[in-house]
C-alpha cells in the first residue's frame, strides 16, 4: 500500500461536505487564567478550506454549496469529524451543520 501525504489541497470533500480550518480557541480567561486543553470550549468558528461539489438531488442535478473557500463560518458545536493536519485543526462536516457565514 502506498503512503498518502495529506495536505489541505489533497483533501477533496464529497457531496455536500465542507472542510473547515478551526479558529484557535482561547488560551486564557478574561481574568488572565491559563486554560489547559481539557478545559477549553470546542470552537464553533472556522474558515472554509475546501468545498465539495454539492448535494446530489433526486433528479441527478447538484445543489451548489452556499459557502466558498475563504468564508468564515459558524457551525454546530458537535458536528462533523475532527481532523489534525500539520499542527492545525480541521473539521469535515455537512453543509447543513453550518449555521451562518460571519462577515
Curated annotation (Swiss-Prot):
<dbReference type="InterPro" id="IPR037124">
    <property type="entry name" value="Chaperonin_GroES_sf"/>
</dbReference>
<dbReference type="GO" id="GO:0051087">
    <property type="term" value="F:protein-folding chaperone binding"/>
</dbReference>
<comment type="function">
    <text>Together with the chaperonin GroEL, plays an essential role in assisting protein folding. The GroEL-GroES system forms a nano-cage that allows encapsulation of the non-native substrate proteins and provides a physical environment optimized to promote and accelerate protein folding. GroES binds to the apical surface of the GroEL ring, thereby capping the opening of the GroEL channel.</text>
</comment>
<dbReference type="InterPro" id="IPR020818">
    <property type="entry name" value="Chaperonin_GroES"/>
</dbReference>
<dbReference type="GO" id="GO:0044183">
    <property type="term" value="F:protein folding chaperone"/>
</dbReference>
<keyword id="KW-0143">Chaperone</keyword>
<dbReference type="InterPro" id="IPR011032">
    <property type="entry name" value="GroES-like_sf"/>
</dbReference>
<comment type="subunit">
    <text>Heptamer of 7 subunits arranged in a ring. Interacts with the chaperonin GroEL.</text>
</comment>
<comment type="similarity">
    <text>Belongs to the GroES chaperonin family.</text>
</comment>
<dbReference type="InterPro" id="IPR018369">
    <property type="entry name" value="Chaprnonin_Cpn10_CS"/>
</dbReference>
<dbReference type="GO" id="GO:0005737">
    <property type="term" value="C:cytoplasm"/>
</dbReference>
<keyword id="KW-0963">Cytoplasm</keyword>
<dbReference type="Pfam" id="PF00166">
    <property type="entry name" value="Cpn10"/>
</dbReference>
<dbReference type="GO" id="GO:0051082">
    <property type="term" value="F:unfolded protein binding"/>
</dbReference>
<dbReference type="GO" id="GO:0046872">
    <property type="term" value="F:metal ion binding"/>
</dbReference>
<dbReference type="GO" id="GO:0005524">
    <property type="term" value="F:ATP binding"/>
</dbReference>
<dbReference type="GO" id="GO:0051085">
    <property type="term" value="P:chaperone cofactor-dependent protein refolding"/>
</dbReference>
<protein>
    <recommendedName>
        <fullName>Co-chaperonin GroES</fullName>
    </recommendedName>
</protein>
